């Protein structure tokens, strides 16, 4: 007769879990050693003990969350922060999009420089860091050519794009991100001095303040450039976590969808970086969470307006769309001081004010910068591109649709990391399935019989998502894409994370009406956090694996 685990004493259950974690760690290490030839690079004992210890620590963390964190929001926040820490260290330095520029601007702010001076240089330690870890590391180390297959003697083309590790010949040394760490850590004994690094073409201050606080604390503790990077990442992650915790606490419905999006590897990858996307995504998630509240009081609309104004500091103009959802709140649900049009007007005015103030500040306190050329070169011209779009609307629609199709509608690129140069196939394939699972659990039977949010809220949020997605594509097409090009340059999956979150409640409503899931809301919320946390941990492991362990591309030159 099978033994039911629920009837076993808690100590026995956790003891079995510890044993299973140790066994899985040994098997995991064995897989790495066999499939990626890790024995030639690292001691088998170190790999085995490391994998087993890692899983035991994860199990201990899971026990502590289950034992001490009270409530859905608290459990979710702790899981977000702990899983984000894994991404902060699994992701090599400066490998988030534009993180090199973000690092330099954040570092300058952390030293008390709130202006922008192109003649100001950084310490040699920072220059060594940027030399060892170029942005888009995988692309920077990609090689292509024609070699000779030693087994057949035939010529064979090779291209290492998408591979962080490569090996020249069967017996050659494996080149990986570990070499960059070795290069940076050995800079004290090197004779050469790197070229000086000056301030980047980046003129924002407020979005980089959390990371700057982390860097300042790291410097006070005696850390160098690399330690400052991780200190900035951790405090940025803390800011992301706090915003997500507030969103989970304020959301009254569809909380499994929010937890799933917040714990997506792509969200944690950005949230644990030096990018201002950490706070930007947190504010997006918070505003959407507030739309699930039945009644809006002054505090609710105040938080929403503050988040709306902040996102317009980091990403101006397009984010003015976030003023409109205030009108999705019906009059009978509005209990704030002041009427909806006044709050919407105040939000719009505040957003425009901070946008114009940010632009003025970035110009007034900018020194010694030469003429700043357009990104993309002389072929990019916003005015000409806009005129081209207006003259050729059908061609523009075709370009938009073709770009979406070529990029798997960006829902199939939730595992594309680095500077879009490190694809992880497993996460690309399973990302949409995780979102579907989130929608299914969000479609659980509500605690109360009356349906809320209303169709007005859910449908309005979905419409906002589609308009926002089209606006993001149009903005990149006009400002970054050469005139008349049939593809949009610069679009990334991270731009659409808030879009998927806004669409999930609409999908949940559809699923509830078609398949009527029997699971209750309490059980759905209890299941989503551990499931998505495990997925996030696995995502962090895969990110580390692809940079440091394998797969290895063997080049026969």
Give residue ranges: language-model regions.
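Transmembrane-helix signature of polytopic, membrane-embedded enzymes
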Residues: 13-17, 71, 223-226, 245-265
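Transmembrane-helix motifs of polytopic, lipid-linked glycan transferases
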Residues: 60, 230-254
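Interfacial juxtamembrane loops and adjacent helix segments
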Residues: 113-229
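Membrane-interface alpha helices of multi-pass inner-membrane proteins
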Residues: 269-271, 300-316, 320-327, 350
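Perimembrane helix-loop-helix junctions
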Residues: 290-299, 321-352
């Amino acid at each position: 007769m099978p033994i039911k685990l629920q009837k076993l004493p808690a100590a026995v259950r956790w003891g079995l879990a510890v044993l299973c974690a140790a066994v899985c760690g040994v098997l995991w290490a064995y897989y790495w050693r066999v499939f990626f030839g890790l024995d030639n690079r690292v001691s088998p004992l170190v790999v085995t003990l490391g994998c087993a210890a890692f899983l035991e620590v994860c199990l201990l963390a899971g026990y502590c969350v289950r034992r001490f964190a009270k409530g859905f929001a608290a459990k979710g926040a702790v899981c977000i922060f702990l899983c984000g820490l894994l991404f902060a260290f699994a992701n090599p330095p400066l490998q988030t999009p534009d993180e090199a520029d973000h690092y330099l601007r954040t570092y300058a702010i952390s030293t008390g420089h709130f202006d922008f001076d192109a003649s100001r240089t950084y310490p040699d330690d920072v220059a060594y860091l940027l030399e060892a870890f170029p942005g888009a590391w995988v692309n920077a180390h990609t090689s292509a050519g024609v070699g000779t297959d030693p087994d057949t003697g035939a010529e064979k083309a090779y291209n290492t794009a998408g591979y962080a590790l490569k090996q020249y010949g069967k017996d050659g040394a494996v080149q990986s991100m570990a070499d960059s760490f070795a290069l940076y850590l050995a800079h004290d004994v090197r004779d050469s001095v790197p070229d000086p690094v000056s301030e980047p073409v980046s003129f924002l201050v407020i979005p980089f303040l959390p990371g700057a606080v982390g860097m300042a604390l790291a410097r006070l503790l005696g850390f160098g450039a690399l330690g400052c990077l991780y200190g900035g990442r951790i405090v940025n992650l803390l800011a992301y976590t706090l915003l997500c915790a507030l969103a989970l606490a304020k959301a009254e419905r569809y909380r499994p969808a929010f937890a799933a999006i917040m714990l997506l590897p792509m969200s944690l990858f950005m949230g644990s970086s030096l990018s201002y996307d950490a706070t930007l995504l947190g504010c997006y998630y918070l505003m959407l969470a507030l739309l699930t509240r039945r009644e809006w009081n002054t505090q609710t609309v105040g938080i929403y307006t503050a988040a709306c104004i902040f996102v317009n500091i980091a990403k101006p103009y397009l984010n003015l769309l976030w003023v409109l959802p205030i009108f999705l709140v019906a009059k009978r649900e509005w209990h704030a001081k002041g009427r909806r049009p006044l709050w919407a007007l105040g939000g719009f005015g505040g957003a425009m004010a901070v946008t114009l103030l940010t632009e003025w500040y970035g110009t007034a306190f900018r020194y010694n910068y030469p003429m700043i050329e357009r990104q993309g070169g002389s072929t990019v011209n916003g005015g000409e591109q806009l005129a081209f779009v207006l003259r050729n609307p059908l061609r523009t629609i075709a370009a938009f649709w073709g770009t979406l199709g070529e990029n798997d509608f960006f829902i199939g690129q939730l595992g594309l990391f680095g500077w879009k140069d490190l694809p992880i196939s497993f996460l690309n394939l399973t990302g949409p399935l995780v979102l579907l699972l989130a929608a299914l659990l969000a479609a659980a039977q509500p605690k109360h019989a009356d349906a809320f949010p209303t169709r007005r809220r859910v449908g309005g949020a979905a419409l906002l998502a589609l308009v926002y997605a089209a606006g993001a594509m149009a903005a990149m097409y006009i400002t970054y894409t050469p005139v008349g090009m049939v593809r949009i340059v610069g679009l990334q999956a991270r731009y659409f994370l808030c879009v998927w979150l806004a669409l999930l409640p609409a999908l949940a409503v559809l699923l509830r009406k078609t398949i009527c899931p029997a699971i209750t809301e309490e059980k759905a919320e209890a299941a989503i956090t551990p499931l998505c946390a495990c997925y996030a941990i696995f995502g962090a492991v895969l990110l580390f694996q692809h940079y440091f362990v394998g797969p290895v591309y063997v080049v026969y030159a």
